[in-house]
């Protein structure tokens, strides 16, 4: 019994998974992208507006140009597993942020196991995973707000080692 018991408060967990499809225009393509996210997550997606006008892309301020959905719990882990399978369980080192979150993109949503529908088309999407530890709520709650100490904050190294261990995955340097 020389091994020390792991503190359960130090275990990393997936707080949420955000799926985003940025279409770049409002209208029919945006509603079709919304259907894709609804099929994948079983939740109603939210439309995102452009922050400012970009004339070269033909985007106006406050025009709806993207859809996203936030998934939590076991469903988030299941969708993330399908996304990582498409990426062959390989992510680059720069996919991980300094705060311990990570993200990646896929080119075709049909790789996730969704049946191709010619009326919808094919969309790529971004996966973004927010990681935390138990006790992170103290920074966000309304009453008795507190801070998380530096030793308990999620770091890039913690997330990379968790990712390698949980998914038996590779993190490439380049």
Curated annotation (Swiss-Prot):
Pfam families reported for this sequence: Ribosomal_L5, Ribosomal_L5_C
GO biological process, one term: translation
Subcellular localization, as worded in the UniProt entry: Cytoplasm; Nucleus
Main location: cytoplasm
GO molecular function per UniProt: RNA binding; rRNA binding; structural constituent of ribosome
Residues annotated with N6,N6,N6-trimethyllysine modification: 75
Note: Present with 21200 molecules/cell in log phase SD medium.
Stated family: Belongs to the universal ribosomal protein uL5 family.
Function summary: Component of the ribosome, a large ribonucleoprotein complex responsible for the synthesis of proteins in the cell. The small ribosomal subunit (SSU) binds messenger RNAs (mRNAs) and translates the encoded message by selecting cognate aminoacyl-transfer RNA (tRNA) molecules. The large subunit (LSU) contains the ribosomal catalytic site termed the peptidyl transferase center (PTC), which catalyzes the formation of peptide bonds, thereby polymerizing the amino acids delivered by tRNAs into a polypeptide chain.
Known partners and oligomeric status: Component of the large ribosomal subunit (LSU). Mature yeast ribosomes consist of a small (40S) and a large (60S) subunit. The 40S small subunit contains 1 molecule of ribosomal RNA (18S rRNA) and 33 different proteins (encoded by 57 genes). The large 60S subunit contains 3 rRNA molecules (25S, 5.8S and 5S rRNA) and 46 different proteins (encoded by 81 genes). Component of a hexameric 5S RNP precursor complex, composed of 5S RNA, RRS1, RPF2, RPL5, RPL11A/RPL11B and SYO1; this complex acts as a precursor for ribosome assembly.
Name by which UniProt lists this protein: Large ribosomal subunit protein uL5B
